[in-house]
Amino acid sequence: TDYRMLFPGDGIDGIKRFFLDTLMTFGKRGLACQPAIVGIGLGGNKDTCMRLGKEAACLRVVGDRNPDPEIASLEDELKEMGNSMGMGVMGISGRSMVADCHMEVAFTHTGGMPVSMHCFCLSSRRASARLHADGKAEMRPNPNWFTPYYRRESVS
């Protein structure tokens, strides 16, 4: 996990630079086990930013994309950038540093742009089920934690 407060003028290039710097540091120092699922939180305050990044890494399904087309495009671009660094599984050379990249965004003050990055180990396992009152258990392959309400898509 890493966090940085960027200047608003850093824009998308600042996010990309932070992503590559952090990923390279994680890979060289053995702080992430590759291939990793990367979660990026952007906006809010520090607490919100960190929470969004962790949720993006841990709760979203691999292959899922943000409903905002610009964010989805950035997720794909960051994944490709991460895999083109020349680092692969266990820090050995290769093109498999990032299994997937997810980004969640929150509203923030214009004076700063908080960004956090979290690497979630590919070997992690999870399951989700809904338990009913009659004792029936229903497995949920995609629990849809990120609803339009949760993402505040209805806020204009």
Set out the residue ranges of the language-model regions.
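Non-transmembrane, aqueous-exposed alpha-helical and coiled segments at domain scale
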Residues: 1-40, 44-156
